[in-house]
Amino acid sequence: MLDIKLLRENPTLVQERLDARKAGEYAIQPILDLDIQQRTLEGDRSQLQARSNEIGKLIGQKIKGGADPKGEEIATLKAEGNEIKQKLADLEPQEKELKAQIYNLLLALPNLPDQSTPVGTNETENVEVRRWGEAHKPTNENILPHWEIGEQLGILEFARSVKVAQSRFVSLVGAGAALERALINFMLDQQIAAGYVEVMPPVLINSDSLTGTGQLPKFAEESFRCADDDLWLTPTAEVPVTNLYRYEILEAENLPIYHCAYTPCFRREAGSYGKDTRGLIRLHQFNKVELVKFVHPETSAAEHEKLVANAEAILQALKLPYRVLELCSGDLGFSAGKCYDLEVWLPSADTYREISSCSNFYDFQARRAGIRFKEAGKKGTQFVHTLNGSGLAIGRTMAAILENYQQPNGTVAVPEVLRPYLKRDFL
């Protein structure tokens, strides 16, 4: 959530940064208009309250000075006091309604792109930062798409999964299930060694949690919801892990806090009809290891670069070619102020595909979720900065392995770092 003070003090800057996302999509003037009304009411209420207090003192003084408690003078003051009390009572719901309107409009505004984020309208204007692993790209021809080699090996079952659920689901069989488990354990082990503390959070989460990280109210149609409870299936571990600290004041000396978490993730993929209808790239249910950070504002830029490096380390250990993109303003996620995407090489399509997004949300999520910190010896509190990134999406990592490690004889080599987990060299 954006700070209303920022909108008041720098309306032109805020509107320009929002327009950098999508011109004309977001307007702050309606919020500022309501804010003026709300502050005017606050001023009226303060004046009325001051007069009410003054009347109370006057009545006491006059009675103490000998005035008749039932006399006309005291009655007049009491009548004015009662009139003020009624006005205050009438103002309360008006002020409450204005605050609610402002809050809801602020919830609908995305984060401001960082000044360093390149300005652009869509993904075609993202900026490539670097590539890694060109020497690891496979040279053999006729590489099958991962879903074909997976079905040939009997480790990916799509057709029967439709019978169990619907399209965009998969069952992993035999070595496929073992590979998924190996990837999860390997990724967690690597991130724990890098200083992250593992969490196994709930995967059913409430609306307040989704609001705290920015999925609600704007993206309700993209998540699965339980019919009879205020519970949703988590779209990413970012949501429950971030909200573990909702409405808490942390000690500055305990920052930064690093967490890693494996969870299944659930997404309706609304608006993706016809895209990636085959394979593991776009499923309704998939597994992911997520990295979440809570950091001091002064270190968040450096922590962001370290987060990207933590995600890259997994791809490098697996020797999977990838590239890093800095997202332009028009392609940023709703809550992100700055974001890097890691894209892994899929040789069957001769292209790179996203496997991790590493975002710095600055104080946007913390302001929505009420996550603050206090520094010893200083008054007041500040909002923490939150960051998160995939480390990595398991299904997409499996897809990349099935293609990049494909052998001419129809087998798939197991990456060396996974062999101790799988106890085999080939699938």
Curated annotation (Swiss-Prot):
Belongs to the class-II aminoacyl-tRNA synthetase family. Type-1 seryl-tRNA synthetase subfamily. One of its GO terms (biological process) is seryl-tRNA aminoacylation. The gene is serS. It catalyses: tRNA(Ser) + L-serine + ATP = L-seryl-tRNA(Ser) + AMP + diphosphate + H(+); tRNA(Sec) + L-serine + ATP = L-seryl-tRNA(Sec) + AMP + diphosphate + H(+). It is found in: Cytoplasm. InterPro entries: aa-tRNA-synt_IIb, aa-tRNA-synth_II, aa-tRNA-synth_II/BPL/LPL, Ser-tRNA-ligase_type_1, Ser-tRNA-synth_1_N, SerRS_1_N_sf, SerRS_core, tRNA-bd_arm. It comes from Picosynechococcus sp. (strain ATCC 27264 / PCC 7002 / PR-6) (Agmenellum quadruplicatum). It holds the Pfam family tRNA-synt_2b. This is Serine--tRNA ligase. L-serine binds at T236, A237, E238, E290, S390. ATP binds at R267, R268, E269, E354, I355, S356, S357. Catalyzes the attachment of serine to tRNA(Ser). Is also able to aminoacylate tRNA(Sec) with serine, to form the misacylated tRNA L-seryl-tRNA(Sec), which will be further converted into selenocysteinyl-tRNA(Sec).
